[in-house]
Swiss-Prot record:
Family label: Belongs to the ATP-dependent DNA ligase family.
Cofactor(s) demanded: Mg(2+); Mn(2+)
Species, as recorded: Staphylothermus marinus (strain ATCC 43588 / DSM 3639 / JCM 9404 / F1)
pH sensitivity of activity: Optimum pH is 6.5.
Binding of ATP, residues: E262, R269, R284, E314, F354, R431, K437
Thermal activity characteristics from the UniProt entry: Optimum temperature is 75 degrees Celsius. Activity declines at temperatures from 75 to 80 degrees Celsius.
Name of protein: DNA ligase
Length: 597
């Protein structure tokens, strides 16, 4: 198939805004496309060479190399290319114009007889696709020269219009505005017999997120082949998405009165695929992130008790010394391509699993949630770092609200509420009311540090095993002359701080809660209120576990600090000099801000 057919379609699509007209153009294009190359045509329409999840290299061509390639292909100087690019503001248009000038010179015989005049051939879609693939896959020593030679050769054979779109494709600026939905509309019409085939095409794409692959099956094997599509280990499934509500009563009505309510962790959503010892991990956006999480790969090999499986969960950063969850931002350290072994130590992670999509040849996406969850529990050997997401089953709005506040207290973003009825299937690639996320519509950002009193201590884990690993902290309520718990802090301590804790706390350890202490959370060791520490956190939040300002803002809950961190000891302050509960209440109200949707 000549590449000019594709370039002509690109040009027509650029000047229209109607999706219906776009569909008509794609229908005409697909009718001309040989079935064996439909996948390549679809990828080029999407502005890519292959799906992101394959983890294959991108083109890796910068602007300077493109300018060199255009100069070589058009017998121009690089400064001429740069000058035209500057005036037009579009490198593709610059290539088109220079190519037209060059071809006009050739026609008029104005070129020197000694000049190199390449033999021009008509480009095909396959040639363009294969050449660009070779450009992308060229790596290592000498790869820049290889890329330049391939691009210059491709542009030499291209017409002016073809050159424009080749350059734009390589730049990642095709700007056609064609969505996957429009491509699926056209595929259904051409190969499926009409719009009635559209849901079948979409479901197949949702189960195997590779539209070129789906198009080729449809074009070469027919609609019945798509009807039989199941999940395939190694090809990501497009994730199911949730609607949003902030009222527990309304939420339970929406899902049928009873639901699973599970923590919505502040981490990276991950789809984990297992085939024997081979593991793939895909992000919410279906990018291959396996290399970022070699520790999760190890967990999946060990603890998924099935030969083939596709499970979903959340990868969450945590502090191994305290067990506390850490903010999503800390996972950014895992993005590095080098020294990942260092990042593993700096940012340890846990996996909280919440769904099963496929296991040992059986598609679970059409099964209701209780059945999927039961099978998930069956095939997972739960450990501290690889476990099922914390959840409850409830039909009670008050119980839902309490669990929501507990989730916030434990470092989660909120909760997910999931329908349990027989139609509660896994709707791949779809946002709907089978899942509802309940997140706070407010937050109280913590700008200032506070001074809190130690009222208890917790034994450490991991490196802190055999030592104290965290402290229970309180504010002072002068009206009642009591100390009210605010947070459990285990972060921010240096090793020497941890080493000194036994000696510091020893004079104040008591066998029971001090009579001036009001606390719901029970530490391993109670401490007489005496030591004061400066604490900072991400934000002030409401908690059913702490007693600072209990019942003042909302029945049954107090004020707490999310992601608290130790700054330093305040030996200059006595316990009654600590931040008061009233001060925390004022901070909470003053800093309250609406969260954007």
């Amino acid at each position: 198939m000549p590449f000019r057919e594709l370039a002509d379609t690109f040009e027509r699509i650029e000047i229209i805004t109607s999706r219906t007209q776009m569909t008509v153009l794609l229908v005409n294009l697909f009718k001309k496309t040989p079935p064996e190359i439909i996948d390549k045509v679809v990828y080029l329409l999407q502005g890519r060479l292959w799906p992101d999840w394959k983890g294959l290299p991108e083109l890796g061509v910068g602007e300077k190399m493109l300018i060199k390639a255009i100069a070589l292909a058009t017998q121009s100087t690089e400064s001429e290319v740069e000058s035209l690019y500057k005036s037009l503001g579009d490198l593709g248009k610059a290539a088109e114009k220079l190519k037209a000038i060059y071809e006009e010179k050739l026609k008029k015989g104005a070129m020197s007889i000694l000049a190199f005049v390449p033999v021009k051939r008509e480009l095909t879609v396959s040639q363009v696709y294969e050449t660009l693939s070779r450009v992308a896959l060229a790596t290592g020593e000498g790869s820049r020269d290889i890329k330049l030679k391939l691009l210059a050769g491709l542009l030499s054979d291209a017409s002016p219009k073809e050159a424009k779109y080749i350059i734009r494709f390589v730049e990642g600026r095709l700007r056609l505005g064609i969505g996957d939905a429009t491509i699926m509309d056209a595929l259904a019409i051409v190969y499926g017999g009409g719009a009635h085939a559209r849901p079948i095409v979409e479901r197949a794409y949702n189960l195997r997120a590779d539209l070129g692959h789906i198009a080729k099956i449809l074009a070469t094997q027919g609609l019945n082949a798509l009807k039989g599509i199941k999940p395939q280990v190694g090809i990501p499934i497009r994730p199911m998405l949730a609607e949003r509500l902030n009222n527990p009563v309304e939420i339970l009505k929406k899902v049928g009165g009873i639901a699973f309510v599970e923590y919505k962790y502040d981490g990276e959503r991950a789809q984990i695929h297992k085939l024997g010892d081979k593991i793939w991990i895909y992000s919410r956006r279906l990018e291959n992130i396996t290399h970022q999480y070699p520790d999760v790969v190890d967990y999946a090999r060990k603890y998924i008790k099935a030969n083939e499986a596709i499970v979903e969960g959340e990868i969450v950063a945590y502090d191994p010394d305290t067990g506390e969850l850490r903010p999503f931002q800390e996972l950014m350290h895992r993005k590095r391509k080098h020294d990942i072994h260092i990042a593993i130590k700096e940012v340890p992670v846990k996996v909280y699993l919440f769904d099963l999509l496929y296991v040992d040849g059986e598609d679970y996406t059409l099964k209701p949630l209780p059945e999927r969850r039961a099978k998930l529990v069956e095939i997972i050997e739960q450990t501290e770092t690889f476990q099922i997401a914390e959840y409850i089953r409830t039909n009670n709005p008050d119980e839902l609200e309490k669990f929501f506040l507990k989730a916030i207290e434990d470092g989660a973003e909120g909760v997910m509420i999931k329908a349990l009825h027989k139609n509660a299937i896994y709707q791949a690639g779809t946002r709907g009311w089978l899942w509802i996320k309940y997140k706070r519509d407010y937050k109280s950002e913590m700008i200032d540090t506070v001074d809190l009193v130690v009222i208890g201590a917790f034994y450490g884990r991991g490196r802190r095993g055999g030592k104290y690993g965290a402290l229970l902290m309180a504010s002072y309520n002068p009206d009642k002359d009591v100390f009210e718990s605010v947070c459990k802090v285990g972060s921010g301590f240096k090793d020497e701080d941890i080493d000194k804790l036994p000696e510091m706390l020893k004079p104040y350890i008591i066998e029971h809660k001090h009579p001036r202490v009001v606390a719901r959370m029970k530490p391993d060791v109670w401490v007489t209120p005496a030591l004061v520490a400066e604490i900072i956190g991400a934000e002030l939040t409401l908690s059913p576990l702490h007693t600072c300002c209990l019942d003042i803002i909302k029945p049954g809950v107090g004020i707490s600090i999310r992601f608290p961190r130790f700054i330093r000891w305040r030996p200059d302050k006595g316990p009654e000099d600590a931040t008061t509960s009233q001060e925390l209440l004022e901070m909470y109200k003053r800093q309250l801000k609406k969260l954007s949707e």
